[in-house]
């Protein structure tokens, strides 16, 4: 059965979809406008995305021939599942993890095997490997840092997984890695079976244009099988302009990380909720009184991500938004103590 993916509300203070809270800088935005005004909109886009891939290759320090781009990293993940997982083959992932994996597996009539993590998202890598071997899985895919928990494994642990499953594709979904520490990019040269997927939706604040990347040695053999003209000229142009200013985003990323740590340090000892350490642009938590907490956020017109169990996820916003979140969390804690 295909599991649907729910889109999100678009009004109030939106801290539910892990978007950047601030729009593109005005100077960069003007550069984008100028670049778009020179496009030949009557012509099809460059299906090779040559300039975009060159810029991203420089940032990632990989050959541009190892890069493929599409409409968000979701499309790249879906393409890999479609290509490698024939009907009844098994994808091995974590639980909880990004719901789109279930969606694409369902479309492909494949199977999915989920390894249950601890409440904070951590898991025993050796047991994960052993279980995957026993189940004879056909593909490894999970987000790192994890969505929704924010937990991240180390490069050493990623290497162990890549080595253990070197005969099948191993895909690390690094949508949030700009806010983390250790990437799998450095494993690509050693492990041809490894792919890394990235996005411009989070750290670069370009969720509205849908631009994501797949990186790996085997990209070249997959390129001709990917949908032509996947990225419009407008998307390529906007993404290219922003990537030329990649260094300017480092300060924004550092601020988000600083705010994340500030918020976590304040709430980590709270008794009425449990918040977990994060390597992403959000905090993940649980509370047995979650319904009351959600109601308190709703009163302040703040939308956070609600899950079916006792858990929730809060995107790191602007400093002002974060202070509003902390105010709600403080009042929730003290009112129930």
Residue ranges and their predicted role:
Residues 1-43, 58, 136:
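N-terminal "arm"/small-domain region of PLP-dependent enzymes with the aminotransferase-like
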Residues 23-25, 193-269, 275:
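PLP-dependent aminotransferase class I/II
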Residues 30, 34-72, 260-262:
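Conserved N-terminal alpha-helix of the aminotransferase class I/II PLP-enzyme fold
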Residues 49-50, 64-88, 210-212:
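Conserved beta-loop-alpha segment that forms the PLP phosphate-binding cup at the N-terminus of a helix
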Residues 83-142:
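PLP-dependent aminotransferase-like
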Residues 119, 257, 267-300, 316:
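Conserved PLP-binding catalytic core of the aspartate aminotransferase-like
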Residues 119-174, 178:
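Active-site phosphate-binding strand-loop segment of PLP-dependent enzymes
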Residues 156, 296-299, 305, 310-337:
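PLP-dependent enzyme catalytic core of the Aspartate aminotransferase-like
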């Amino acid at each position: 059965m295909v599991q649907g993916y729910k889109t999100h509300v678009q009004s109030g203070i939106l801290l539910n979809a892990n978007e950047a809270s601030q729009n593109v800088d005005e100077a960069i935005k003007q550069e984008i406008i100028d670049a778009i005004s020179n496009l030949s909109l009557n012509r099809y886009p460059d299906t090779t995305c040559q300039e975009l891939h060159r810029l991203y290759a420089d940032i990632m320090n990989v050959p541009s021939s190892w890069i493929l781009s599409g409409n968000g990293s979701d499309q790249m993940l879906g393409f890999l599942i479609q290509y490698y997982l024939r009907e009844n083959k098994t994808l091995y992932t974590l639980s909880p993890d990004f719901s789109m994996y279930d969606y694409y597996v369902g479309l492909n009539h494949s199977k999915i095997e989920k390894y249950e993590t601890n409440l904070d998202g951590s898991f025993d890598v050796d047991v994960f490997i052993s279980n995957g071997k026993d189940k004879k899985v056909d593909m490894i895919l999970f987000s790192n840092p994890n969505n929704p928990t924010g937990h991240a494994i180390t490069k050493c642990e990623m290497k162990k997984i890549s080595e253990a499953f070197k005969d099948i594709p191993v895909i690390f979904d690094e949508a949030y890695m700009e806010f983390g520490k250790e990437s799998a990019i450095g494993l690509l040269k050693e492990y041809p079976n490894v792919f890394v997927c990235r996005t411009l939706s989070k750290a670069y604040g370009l969720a509205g244009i849908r631009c994501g990347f797949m990186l790996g040695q085997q990209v070249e053999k997959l390129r001709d099988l990917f949908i032509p003209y996947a990225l419009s000229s407008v998307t390529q142009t906007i993404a290219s302009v922003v990537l030329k200013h990649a260094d300017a985003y480092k300060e924004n990323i550092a601020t988000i990380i600083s705010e994340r740590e500030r918020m976590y340090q304040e709430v980590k000892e709270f008794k009425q909720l449990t918040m977990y350490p994060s390597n992403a642009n959000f905090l993940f938590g649980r509370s047995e009184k979650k319904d009351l907490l959600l109601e308190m956020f709703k009163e302040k017109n703040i939308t956070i991500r609600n899950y079916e169990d006792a858990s929730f996820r809060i995107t790191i916003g602007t400093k002002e938004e974060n202070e509003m979140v902390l105010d709600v969390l403080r009042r929730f804690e003290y009112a129930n103590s």
